[in-house]
Amino acid sequence: MKIFSISNQKGGVGKTTTSVNLAASLALNKQKVLLIDLDPQGNASSGAGIDKLTLNNSIYETLIGQETINDVVRASEDNMFDIAPANQSLAGAEIEMVNIDHREYILKNAFKTLKKTYDYILIDCPPALNLLTVNALAASDSVIIPMQCEYYALEGLSDLVNTIKKVKKSLNPDIEIEGLLRTLFDRRN
C-alpha cells in the first residue's frame, strides 16, 4: 500500500482536483483506492458525490477516537473508489486532538487496519500547515505538491518543504517528496 499526501498550504492550487482525479485515474487502472478528505471544506467529498450535509460519520470521528476508519469509509457515488469524507465538523478536530497522546500519529495508526484493503491511499490536505496536515505527513510515504505556475507560489513552497523536513526528522523518516505538480498553467505568462 502506498500513501500519498497531496499538500500545499496555499489554497486554490488544485489539491482537491488533483486528489479526486488521481483517485479516479488509479481506479480506472484497476487499483483499489481510498481517498481521505482531510479538508474541513469537504470539497473532495462533494467531488466524490457525497452529501456533506447528511454525513453521520466522517474522518472527524476517526480523528477524535469515536469511530474507526473502517466505520467512516464509504464508496464514491460512482463506486470507482472509496472515500473517508469530511464536512465542517472537521474544523474543530484540532482542538479535540490536542489532549490525545501521540496525536501526530492518529491517521497512521488508523491506516494499519487497511494495509491489505487498498493499493493506494490519497490524502487531500487542508490549505494550512496544521495538526491535520502533520497527521497526513506522518502517515504518508510521499507528498505530491500541486503548485501554481506563478512567482508567489515559490514563497509558500519553502515553508512546506521545511515542514516536510521537520516531519522527516522527528515523525516519519521515510517520507519523500514525490514531486511538484504544475497546476493552473497559462502559456501566456
Where on the chain are the PLM-derived regions?
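P-loop NTP-binding core
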Residues: M1-N189
